[in-house]
Swiss-Prot record:
This is UPF0758 protein RPB_0700. It comes from the Bacteria. PROSITE patterns: MPN, UPF0758. Residues 1-27 are annotated as: Disordered. Zn(2+) binds at H199, H201, D212. The keyword Protease applies. InterPro entries: MPN, RadC_JAB, RuvA_2-like, UPF0758, UPF0758_CS, UPF0758_N. Belongs to the UPF0758 family. It holds the Pfam family RadC. The keyword NAD does not apply. GO terms for biological process: proteolysis. A motif (JAMM motif) lies at residues 199-212.
Length: 250
């Protein structure tokens, strides 16, 4: 038997939290307005108007479209220290953060890769010694926040333009093995007439050690008789950079 259709209105929910919205009029999550306001601030005033966690929120929006990402962004900054350090954090450490999935990690690494590509382009397109600030920016972007020591060589031609940028060695948290004769051999293979050596200090303090100074002098002694100049040895860290040439240490 079919029940008769009642003309009476359906009962209202007893609790207003159970209110039924008409189709097409569902209330937007509270964070949608926040996202639009944050984007608007970025469009109008740029990144300088945003704190580190707010800039990180913008990075996470696309990977996590249905979540309030502010707590996650704040947690990442608290864990790693800054926006830059979060971008450079190793993927295994990022995976330790609760709520940060592979899509979000990919977004973070994409931003880091884009920044490195931009700064490298600024170095490649100019004479290196006439764009020293671009060299420093590139070295800090690619190496300053790494959790292990890295040793990189910029090989230059006779016009001091970049021929090659090669990561030679990756070591431990406080040591990288360096082979001076291999560095000079590689310079000759590339027909480079000069090199700039770069390595990082994961501790954040770029102060040269005695081992750094001695290794630099050894490379200079091998390279110069073969026509390869050592323009500088730069050490980068979270807290700045040091130029052994500028400090007159070789």
């Amino acid at each position: 038997m079919v029940d008769p259709i009642s003309n009476a209105a359906p009962p209202m929910p007893a609790d207003s939290s159970e209110r039924l919205d008409p189709p097409g009029f569902a209330e937007a999550p509270h964070y949608h307005g926040h996202r639009e306001r944050l984007r608007e601030r970025f469009r109008e005033a740029g990144a300088a108007a945003l704190s580190d966690y707010e800039l990180l929120e913008l990075v996470l929006f696309r990977a996590l479209p249905r979540r309030d990402v502010k707590p996650l962004a704040k947690a990442l900054i608290a864990r790693f220290g800054s926006f830059a350090e979060t971008m450079q954090a190793p993927e295994p450490r990022l995976r330790e953060v609760s709520g940060l999935g592979e899509a979000a990690i990919t977004e973070i690494k994409l931003v880091a890769a884009a920044a490195a590509r931009v700064t490298k382009g600024q170095v490649k397109s100019r004479t290196v010694l006439s764009s020293w600030s671009a060299v420093i920016d590139y070295c800090r972007t690619t190496m300053a926040f790494a959790d292990r020591e890295q040793f990189r060589i910029l090989f230059l031609d006779k016009r001091n333009q970049l021929i090659a940028d090669e990561l030679q060695q990756v070591g431990t948290v406080d040591h990288t093995p360096v082979y001076p004769r291999e560095i000079v051999k590689r310079a000759l293979e590339l027909s480079a007439t000069a090199v700039i050596m770069v390595h990082n200090h994961p501790s954040g303090d770029p102060t040269p050690s005695q081992a750094d100074i001695q290794m630099t002098k050894t490379i200079v002694a091998i390279a110069e008789p073969l026509g390869v100049a050592v323009h500088d040895h730069i050490i980068v860290g979270k807290n700045g950079h040091a130029s052994l040439k500028g400090l007159k240490l070789f």
